[in-house]
């Protein structure tokens, strides 16, 4: 079935890449494009490096989206998120890049990314960013107002 959907990673030996690589992301056709499910994906073991100190940063990344014609393949998403492991970038930049990469891949009706990072020096950073096509702008605004 993976070959029918043109998926390269699902069902194969996993090559773990720890340098940022958006080309790891894969999508498959949405089997129900007439429905509007809000899909939640959660990565509880997200890590990246502080671009100043090179110290590791840890957090949970939440991705919620309403698909249009394509859906993200979860193994490719896991490998993509793991590719941030040795990537030096601020939390906000990581979250923005994840959103842009997924929007570029999926062209969804709506997509949001929220990062809940472990505090450093007593400060917790929790960036939130969202995107919507024209017909979902009201939903986007309501979600933004309700962001944690």
Curated annotation (Swiss-Prot):
Keywords per UniProt: Cytoplasm, NADP, Oxidoreductase, Queuosine biosynthesis
Entry-linked NCBIfam families: QueF-II (TIGR03139)
Family stated for the protein in its record: Belongs to the GTP cyclohydrolase I family. QueF type 1 subfamily.
InterPro entries xref list: GTP-CH-I_C/QueF, NADPH_dep_7-cyano-7-deazaG_red, QueF, QueF_type1
Binding site for substrate: 72-74, 91-92
A Pfam family this chain is assigned to: QueF
Organism: Helicobacter acinonychis (strain Sheeba)
Cellular component aspect of the GO annotation: cytoplasm
Main location: cytoplasm
Pathway: tRNA modification; tRNA-queuosine biosynthesis
Enzyme class, first EC level, given as a word: oxidoreductase
The protein's name in its UniProt record: NADPH-dependent 7-cyano-7-deazaguanine reductase
Reaction it catalyzes: 7-aminomethyl-7-carbaguanine + 2 NADP(+) = 7-cyano-7-deazaguanine + 2 NADPH + 3 H(+)
Catalytic residues in the record: 50, 57
Domain of life: Bacteria
Subcellular location: Cytoplasm
Purpose of the protein: Catalyzes the NADPH-dependent reduction of 7-cyano-7-deazaguanine (preQ0) to 7-aminomethyl-7-deazaguanine (preQ1).
GO BP, one annotated term: tRNA modification
GO molecular function, one term: preQ1 synthase activity
EC number(s) stated in the UniProt entry for this protein: 1.7.1.13
